[in-house]
A protein has these predicted regions:
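Acidic, low-complexity intrinsically disordered segments
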Residues: 465-496
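Charged, low-complexity interaction regions
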Residues: 476-483, 513-524, 543
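Long, leucine- and charge-enriched amphipathic alpha-helices
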Residues: 491, 498, 505-507, 511-515
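Long, low-complexity, intrinsically disordered segments
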Residues: 551-568
Length: 568
């Protein structure tokens, strides 16, 4: 199959490996090739394989032109590179499962062609076989995922989806998969290169790939940082092939659109779904995503904390540290790594530990898992965590909906509270004092989730507002800016406390040295102690800010006209 490769001489980026792969049969030859495929031996493949085939053929996984031979397979598995040294983090292997497929494979040889058909037995692609080889499933799991634990979804997929013999060779795509509701939003690399650099004339584009969560404020923090210096923002929510509990794809796309339409610069932001096979390879998958962004034409890759993370299998910053294994020029894309984003009520802004010095008692965490769980409990997360435009749509599409008979969603309530409200177990309120005893996970119930949510709604913005008010009252010396009611209240407090002190002074004078009834009457010592406390309260009462006080703050050593340049 011959196609004319795209040229990138005038672009600020190049596809990985230098050539954007195009293994899609030309339209004029398609019907003929489909008919020829029907005459070939056939192997039936599942939807995940169909998606991978399409990604290879359309250049998403350049420089790969098909499934890997044994040499490349082993090189990638052991070193994270193709046999020629090109960085490639995950093996693209094809080992069909099933007795019928195994029988077909036994009759194939190097040089043969085989049709790959979907569940409806329609030819999807033709594979020309360059290699057939056995592989070790346990070794694959250990090298790729760092574990052989079947509870890891990637490990489970090896044993559940893969046969014993792997076929390598170039692919020719005959029919694209139907993207259903996302078909109208589908963009292949050849489309985005043209959009970025021919139509929009961008000189830089930041890519961002995200999974099962609706657009939240942590994402937005990363996006806005990028838009300060990069021309375009290319957002690719992953659709299809997700984990079992998630926000359904169409709702996530709608949630994205609702926020982008309202809060993002329209000419600089592009939303395009990405349909991929979930590999669940943690840090290695992060490298893959960066190279996918590169093949779509992005000059920059935005990587958050725990990108492509799988539960507790990997350190939360493993997706960052893996980039230390490769030189920037080998990757060919500017990778921007972002720490965990949270909302600090003391800073009154979104921040990371790199920029915020405050204690966790002031924080609202932004946890994708926690967000989904709150939606299941029927609670919109705090606006500082997810914009209501996004949450309102996402709550309609969360799967599963509601909670189980045990009062929990897919996680115990205590984990939800801990993931979203890190202060709650130890502090009485957001930014508040410590509890006498921290709450144990067993003590935390759905009522605590409700209480923490209401606390955040009421006080997330109040903390900094209260601080600001205190500073304004003290520092404003424009009389028109002083709140008269506050000064009136302070005057009243002072007068009333002076009245209390006057009465207590009389009481001390009249009190006996020893009271006849220690519950009904006070002796001089006790009355004196009350007087001391009352005087301390008076001293601690802030004074009213009068015009005389304000005038004392405004003075200059020279006549005012001198500051305007008039020395006469």
């Amino acid at each position: 199959m011959k196609t004319t490769p795209m040229t990138f001489a005038n672009c600020p980026q190049q596809p990985h490996g230098g050539v954007l792969v195009d293994r899609v049969v030309p339209e004029a030859q398609r019907e003929k090739e489909i008919a020829r495929a029907r005459s070939l031996p056939s192997i039936r493949v599942d939807l995940e394989a169909v998606i991978t085939i399409e990604m290879i053929a359309t250049g998403v996984l350049s420089p790969n032109t098909g499934f890997m031979n044994e040499e490349n397979y082993k090189s990638v598995l052991n070193t994270g590179r193709l046999a020629d040294g090109t960085v490639w983090p995950v093996p693209l292997s094809f080992a069909p499962i099933g007795d019928r497929n195994a029988e077909v494979i036994r009759q194939l040889s190097v040089g043969d062609e085989v049709a790959l058909t979907n569940v409806d037995n329609d030819p999807v692609a033709i594979l020309k076989i360059d290699d057939l080889f056995d592989y070790d499933k346990t070794e694959r799991a250990r090298q790729l995922f760092g574990t052989t634990d079947r509870s890891h979804p990637g490990v489970d997929s090896i044993y559940r989806r893969m046969g014993d013999v792997s076929l390598g060779g170039p692919l020719t795509l005959l029919q694209r998969a139907d993207w259903g509701p996302f078909e109208k939003l589908r963009q292949e690399p050849k489309d985005t290169w043209n959009l970025f650099y021919t139509e929009k004339k961008f000189r830089s584009v930041a890519g961002f790939i995200t999974g099962a969560n609706p657009l939240h404020r942590g994402h937005e923090y990363i996006h806005r940082n990028a838009l300060e210096e990069i021309d375009g923002l290319f957002l690719q929510p992953l659709v299809e092939m997700a984990k079992r509990e998630y926000v359904r794809h169409e709702y996530r796309m709608l949630a994205y659109r609702s926020v982008l339409d309202t809060y993002y610069p329209k000419e600089r932001t592009i939303l395009s779904p990405l349909r991929v096979t979930y590999i669940f390879a943690g840090p290695r998958e992060t490298i893959l995503h960066a190279l996918i962004m590169k093949n779509y034409g992005c000059t920059h890759a935005l990587i958050g904390r725990d990108h492509a993370g799988i539960g507790s299998f990997y350190d939360k910053y493993a997706s960052h540290s893996i980039f230390d294994e490769f030189k920037p020029e080998e990757l060919g894309i500017d990778v921007r790594l972002f720490h965990e984003v949270f909302y600090c009520t003391r800073c009154a802004s979104h921040a990371t530990t790199q920029t915020c010095p405050h204690d966790t008692k002031y924080r609202l965490n932004i946890s994708g898992t926690g967000i989904r769980e709150m939606l299941r409990h029927g609670i919109l997360p705090p606006k500082e965590v997810v914009r209501p435009e996004s949450a309102r749509i996402a709550i309609q599409g969360v799967q599963p909906k509601g909670i189980n008979n045990d009062g929990h969603g897919t996680l115990p309530v205590s984990k939800v509270v801990q993931s979203m409200f890190p202060y709650y177990a130890e502090h009485t309120r957001l930014g508040g004092s410590k509890r006498l005893q921290p709450l144990s996970p067993e003590e935390i119930t759905v009522r605590d989730l409700e209480a923490a949510s209401l606390d955040a709604r009421a006080n997330a913005t109040n903390i900094y507002n209260d601080i600001y008010r205190e500073y304004c009252t003290l520092a404003d010396h424009n009389p028109g800016m002083q709140p008269a009611w506050v000064n009136e209240a302070r005057d009243s407090m002072i007068r009333h406390q002076q009245m209390v002190i006057g009465d207590l002074q009389e009481k001390v004078q009249q009190a006996p040295e020893q009271a006849s009834d220690e519950f009904m009457y006070q002796d001089k010592s006790e009355a004196s102690r009350e007087l001391e406390v009352a005087k301390a309260l008076l001293e601690q009462t802030p004074p009213a800010v009068t015009e005389d006080v304000l005038q004392e703050r405004v003075w200059n050593p020279l006549p005012y006209q001198r500051y305007k340049g008039k020395d006469d």
